[in-house]
Amino acid sequence: MALLAPESLGNANRAGRDGRRGTGELSRGALGVAMNLPTISLLLLVLAYPVVYAGYLSLHRVGIAQLRRGDFPWNNGDNYARLLEDPLFALALKNTILFTLLVVGVEVVLAIAIALLLNQASLWTSRLARLLILIPYGVPPITNGLIWSFMYSFQFGFLNRVLFSSGLINEPVNWAGNPDTALYAVAVAYIWRTLPFAVLIVHAALQGIPRELHEAATVDGASAWQRFRSITLPLLMPVIIVILILRTSFAFAVFEEILAITQGGPGDASYVAAWYSYKLTFSPPNNIGMGAASAYVLALLVGLFAIAYVRLLYRRIA
């Protein structure tokens, strides 16, 4: 009878343990998927149906008359062709991109600066500041727009009173009613509401950077700017990319502040893509199909920005 060498027995035992471990890990993975399947299915149902249905509407001629009859004629992509030929849509896209670049750029810079200050503050001061910073984030967007609309009021606005009493202006400024300042006025209101999210995320990321790295760089004679550029900023890049993606997607869809402060005006100065889709869909003649097409184009642009951000992140990692 053949006998197995001790090495062969050891290898067989290890193979058996590895096989059982692999089977156990597979079983745990399958169990995790099975337990999350109801939630995933519900999310797909809630999210996928509106997306697919909007895509269906964007390829058909849909108005009030068609809704009443329940008959949506196929229009061979005419909604998209008319959309791309509409100069108002081009203007809305230009305003949206300008608004997004302004809002996201300012928000990221301010978030990093404020988070760095909080990181240097005492524990009690940092906690109090974070609590106060969270207040604007809890304000509903439409309420935030109404608050800033009152602040921008030409005759009774708080902003004009403060600037006039401090001697910075000689007469009231119509912030929301001037074509040169309307979009920027909305941007300020939007940043005030959304900045806290970015600040808290960046501050949490700063807490995870080992102090030993900064201490070693200080010993080597690195200045504060060199430490920030070589240590802090590279380690913050993954978080910054996440903020860029989230804030870009939300800024592209800005609507409530536009509705409350300018309603797309004066003229077309603050006419953004979400407002364009809203007016197409809910204002006579209620071109619902073309409104859905504009929403799809907007989603495509957001996706392109997200891809660019992710490519930037991978390039930084490489």
What are these regions (language model features)?
Residues 1-26:
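Short, Lys/Arg-rich, polar N-terminal cytosolic tail immediately upstream
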Residues 28-318:
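A structural signal for multi-pass alpha-helical bundles of membrane permease subunits
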